[in-house]
């Protein structure tokens, strides 16, 4: 009996020691990954204790670059495009300029970054996109990138509705047209047409980013502004476009450090509810 008890005690001690070792390893992995990702993005050293608020910088750098960046299967380019559209949506322009440079450092092309920001326009409005592009263009110029960039438009005045509808209908059907039919003065039909022509015909048809990427970025923008009805519709559209629930979830988690927990949790609960139906 004593031998059995001693054996059990040793097993418990061994498991406890392994657990403590794993915790230390996870902590070290978090720090090492933070430093690696930060260097790739910004070319500097993370966790250096410098500046006026080194404590909060230490917390945010470990959290973002050491934990969020290893949650879900997103490549670093996609993560940085998501960060940029979040910052553009919130009009955090100094941070956007810094992250535009970081995006270039990890392989996002100027066209991809510009298209990511343009994709926000139907959701957040043109003034905010123009503000965002001001600092993004500054980042371009500082890198010796000539602006304006090459056009990525693929539609004409004659076919923008048709081409937009070709993308919109398989993903969303005619729900908006039906929902707006009773708007006073018959103007709901015009608004539904604007949506097809502008959101899908003018933007979604553009080259530079594919439809799954555009839908993923759009979901992130909607997450930032907390547009609950649209989050439901665009989650379904993301799935139809080929983005898995896990990928959309990882994208929302990538937004979390920049937008806070409440807005991200709202979007995560919508993903959960939609995928459980």
What does each of the following model-derived ranges do?
Residues 1-22:
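Bacterial Sec-dependent N-terminal signal peptides
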Residues 20-76, 129-211, 240, 257, ...:
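Acidic, glycine/proline-rich low-complexity segments that act as flexible tails and inter-domain linkers
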Residues 47-114:
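Ordered, small/hydrophobic-rich secondary-structure cores
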Residues 75, 91-114, 118, 128-141, ...:
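Extended intrinsically disordered, low-complexity coil regions enriched in Ser, Thr, Gly, Ala
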Residues 78-87, 116-117, 213-222, 251-255:
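Short, structured motif recognition centered on aromatic/hydrophobic residues
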Residues 89-93, 123-126, 224, 255-261:
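Alpha-helical transition-metal enzyme core signature, strongest for iron centers
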Residues 206-207, 220-225:
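Short, glycine/charged-rich beta-strand-loop motifs at protein surfaces that mediate ligand recognition
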């Amino acid at each position: 009996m004593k031998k059995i008890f001693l054996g059990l005690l040793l097993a418990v001690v061994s498991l406890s020691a392994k657990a403590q070792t794993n915790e230390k390893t996870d902590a070290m992995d978090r720090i090492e990954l933070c430093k690696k990702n930060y260097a790739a993005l910004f070319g500097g050293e993370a966790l250096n204790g410098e500046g006026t608020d080194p404590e909060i910088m230490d917390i945010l750098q470990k959290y973002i670059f050491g934990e969020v960046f290893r949650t879900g299967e997103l490549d670093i380019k996609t993560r940085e495009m998501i960060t940029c559209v979040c910052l553009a949506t919130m009009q955090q322009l100094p941070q956007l300029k810094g992250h535009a440079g970081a995006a270039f450092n990890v392989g996002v092309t100027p066209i991809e970054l510009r298209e990511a920001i343009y994709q926000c326009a139907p959701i957040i409005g043109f003034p905010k996109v123009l503000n965002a592009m001001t600092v993004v263009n500054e980042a371009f110029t500082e890198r010796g990138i000539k602006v304006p960039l090459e056009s990525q438009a693929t539609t004409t005045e004659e076919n923008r509705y048709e081409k937009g509808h070709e993308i919109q209908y398989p993903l969303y059907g005619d729900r908006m047209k039906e929902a707006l039919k009773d708007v006073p003065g018959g103007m709901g039909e015009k608004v539904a047409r604007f949506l097809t022509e502008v959101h899908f015909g003018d933007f979604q048809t553009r080259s530079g980013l594919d439809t799954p990427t555009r839908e993923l970025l759009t979901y992130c923008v909607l997450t930032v502004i907390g547009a609950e009805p649209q989050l439901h519709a665009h989650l379904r559209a993301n799935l139809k476009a080929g983005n898995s629930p896990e990928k959309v979830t990882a994208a929302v988690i990538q937004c979390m450090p920049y937008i806070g927990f409440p807005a991200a949790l709202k979007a995560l609960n919508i993903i959960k509810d939609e995928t459980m139906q």
